[in-house]
C-alpha cells in the first residue's frame, strides 16, 4: 500500500476539524486543490485498504455513555481463550495484551450507562473466572489522539473543559452513528439524518454544538495507526500523590509524542498508579526517546513509573454509546 502526496495531505490535515457543512468533501477538495469526487474516491480506497477506520467522531468518555479501562491477570496458557471471551462482550472496543505488569490483558469497556457498564464487567468475570481491575477516568489532560504523517512530532492540544449542559436526549443516537462513520457521498449529513429521522441542518447543528462543547473530542478521519506504521504502543503509568497529579499531567500532556494523558482511579492494594500516558511510535526506540523527555520534566523527575508495551491487539473499534446503534 503506497500513498502519494495527496493521500498524505488528506490524512494529515483532516484527522480533526472535518468541515461541518453540507458538502464537507467538497470543502476538503478546495483546500487540497482537487475535486470532491477525488477526495471521496481516495477516502474509500484508504478505508478499503485498511488505512482508515471511518470518517466520523471520537466521543469523550463518560459523557453520553459510560466507560472504563480494565485489566485482567491472565495466565499465559489462557490468553487466547480469555481474549476471545472479553472480545465477545459487545461493549469492549479496545483490547490489548501488554507486557510489564501482572495485569496483562487490558481492555476498554463501554456502555450506555454506569449500570450497563457494571453488568458488562460482571459478565466478563463470569465468563473468564477472573476479576477485572476497573480504572475509570478521573481527569483528562489530553485525549485528542491524532497521528502526524507530515513533519516532526508535535504536542497534542491540551484538553479543554466540557459543557455537559449541551447534551440533548437524541444526541446519543447521533454520537453512536458518528462512531460508526459517515457515508462517503457528497452530502453525508443528509444520509445520516435520514437514518436518524432528522434533517441535514439539525444534524450539522448538533455536531457543531457537541464538538464546541468538547463532548465530541475529534471529528474527522479516524486512521488505523498500525497500518500507517505507528506499530508501537506504550502505556506508561506513574505513581505520585494526588496533589501532584494535576501539575505532572499537564506537563506530560504537552510533551511531543505523548498521544494521550489522563488520571485514572487507583485501587488500594491492587493499583496505585494514577497517572497514565500513551506513546504511539514507529519503533520502541522512538517511544523510549519520548519517555526520556517525559522523565526529564521537573514534575516527573524521580517519580516511579512502569512501561507497558502492547504485544498484541485483539480489538479496536468505536465505543458503545446507545442501546441500539443508529
Swiss-Prot record:
Domain of life (superkingdom): Bacteria
Pathway in which the depicted protein is active: Porphyrin-containing compound metabolism
Top EC category: lyase
GO molecular function, a single term: lyase activity
Presence of the UniProt keyword Cell inner membrane in the record: no
A Pfam family annotated for this UniProt entry: NirdL-like_HTH
Keywords: Lyase
Enzyme Commission number(s) of this protein: 4.1.1.111
Catalytic activity, reaction form: siroheme + 2 H(+) = 12,18-didecarboxysiroheme + 2 CO2
Function (record text): Involved in heme d1 biosynthesis. Catalyzes the decarboxylation of siroheme into didecarboxysiroheme. Siroheme is probably decarboxylated to monodecarboxysiroheme, which is in turn decarboxylated to didecarboxysiroheme.
Similarity-based family: Belongs to the Ahb/Nir family.
Subunit structure: Forms a complex composed of NirDL, NirG and NirH. All proteins are required for the total conversion of siroheme to didecarboxysiroheme.
Name of the protein this chain belongs to: Siroheme decarboxylase NirDL subunit
Organism from which the protein derives: Paracoccus pantotrophus (Thiosphaera pantotropha)
Encoding gene, per UniProt annotation: nirDL
Amino acid at each position: 500500500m503506497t500513498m502519494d502526496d495527496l493521500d498524505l495531505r488528506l490524512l494529515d490535515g483532516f484527522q480533526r476539524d472535518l468541515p461541518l457543512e453540507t458538502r464537507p468533501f467538497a470543502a476538503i477538495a478546495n483546500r487540497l486543490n482537487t475535486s470532491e469526487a477525488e477526495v471521496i474516491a481516495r477516502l474509500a480506497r484508504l478505508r478499503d485498504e485498511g488505512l482508515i477506520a471511518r470518517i466520523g467522531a471520537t466521543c469523550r468518555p463518560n459523557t453520553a455513555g459510560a466507560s472504563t479501562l480494565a485489566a485482567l491477570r491472565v495466565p499465559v496458557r489462557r490468553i487466547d481463550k480469555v481474549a476471545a471471551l472479553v472480545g465477545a462482550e459487545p461493549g469492549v472496543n479496545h483490547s490489548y495484551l501488554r507486557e510489564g505488569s501482572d495485569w496483562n490483558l487490558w481492555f476498554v469497556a463501554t456502555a450506555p450507562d454506569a449500570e450497563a457498564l457494571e453488568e458488562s464487567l460482571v459478565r466478563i468475570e463470569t465468563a473468564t473466572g477472573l476479576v477485572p481491575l476497573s480504572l475509570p477516568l478521573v481527569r483528562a489532560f489530553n485525549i485528542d489522539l491524532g497521528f502526524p504523517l507530515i513533519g516532526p512530532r508535535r504536542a497534542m492540544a491540551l484538553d479543554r473543559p466540557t459543557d455537559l449542559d449541551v447534551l440533548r436526549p437524541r444526541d446519543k443516537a447521533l454520537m453512536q452513528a458518528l462512531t460508526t462513520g459517515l457515508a462517503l457521498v457528497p452530502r453525508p449529513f443528509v444520509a445520516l439524518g435520514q437514518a436518524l429521522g432528522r434533517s441535514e441542518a439539525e444534524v450539522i447543528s448538533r455536531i457543531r454544538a457537541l464538538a464546541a462543547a468538547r463532548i465530541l473530542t475529534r471529528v474527522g478521519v479516524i486512521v488505523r495507526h498500525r497500518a500507517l506504521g505507528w506499530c508501537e504502543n506504550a502505556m506508561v503509568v506513574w505513581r505520585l500523590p494526588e496533589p501532584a497529579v494535576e501539575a505532572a499531567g499537564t506537563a506530560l500532556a504537552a510533551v511531543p509524542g505523548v498521544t494521550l494523558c489522563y488520571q485514572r482511579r487507583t485501587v488500594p492494594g491492587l493499583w496505585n498508579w494514577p497517572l497514565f500516558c500513551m506513546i504511539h511510535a514507529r519503533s520502541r526506540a522512538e517511544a523510549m526517546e519520548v519517555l526520556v523527555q517525559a522523565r526529564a520534566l521537573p514534575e516527573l523527575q524521580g517519580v516511579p513509573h512502569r512501561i507497558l508495551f502492547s504485544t498484541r491487539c485483539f480489538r479496536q473499534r468505536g465505543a458503545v454509546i446507545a442501546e441500539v446503534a443508529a
